[in-house]
Amino acid sequence: MDYFTLFGLPAQYSIDLPALTIRFQDLQRQFHPDKFASGTPAEQLAAVSQSATINQAWQTLRNPLARAEYLLSLHGFDLTSEQHTVRDTAFLMEQLELREELDEIDQAKDEARLESFIKRVKGMFDSRHQQMVEQLNNETWDVAADSVRKLRFLDKLRSSAEQLEEKLLDF
C-alpha cells in the first residue's frame, strides 16, 4: 500500500495537510505498539512495523520535497539513483558560483550580504518549486524529476546559508 492510500489521500502532490495530520493521529492511536503490549509476539511485531510505516509515511508526505520524490517514485523515477543526476551544466555552474559566493560571505563575515543572499536563494527555490508543482499537476514526470533534483541543490544551499547565518549571529 502506498503512503497516499495509507492516509486516504489522492496520489497527487497537492494534499490536504490538516487532513494528513488528523489521519496520522488516528492511525497512530489505532496501531500504537503499546496497545498490543499484551498481544502475542507476532502481534507486537506487526504493530511496531505498522507504526514505523505510518511514521515514515507521515514524514515523507508532510515534507514537500520528500513528497514530490515519493510521488515520482510511484511513477518509476528513482531519484536516489546515481544515474539520475542533474545534467544541466548551466544550472550546475550557477550552483558552483553561488557556493563560492557563500564562501566569500563567510570569509568576510558580511551579515547584510548574507541576508540578501538568503532572500535570493529563497526566491530561486520558490520559483523552481512553483514550476515543479505545475509539472507534477500536469503529470510531466520527467521534467518534474529534473526540477526536484535542482530543488535539492537549492535546498542544501539554503540550509548552508541559514547555518552560516546562525554562526554569524552567535559571533
Curated annotation (Swiss-Prot):
Q: Quick one: a GO biological-process term for this protein?
A: protein complex oligomerization
Looking up SMART domains in the UniProt record yields: DnaJ (SM00271)
Keyword Membrane part of the UniProt annotation: no
Domain of life per record: Bacteria
Looking up SUPFAM superfamilies in the UniProt record yields:
Chaperone J-domain (SSF46565), HSC20 (HSCB), C-terminal oligomerisation domain (SSF47144)
Q: Name one GO cellular component term.
A: iron-sulfur cluster transfer complex
Q: Which UniProt keywords apply?
A: Chaperone
Described function: Co-chaperone involved in the maturation of iron-sulfur cluster-containing proteins. Seems to help targeting proteins to be folded toward HscA.
What is stated as this protein's family in its record?
Answer: Belongs to the HscB family.
Q: What is this protein called?
A: Co-chaperone protein HscB
Q: Tell me what organism the protein belongs to.
A: Enterobacter sp. (strain 638)
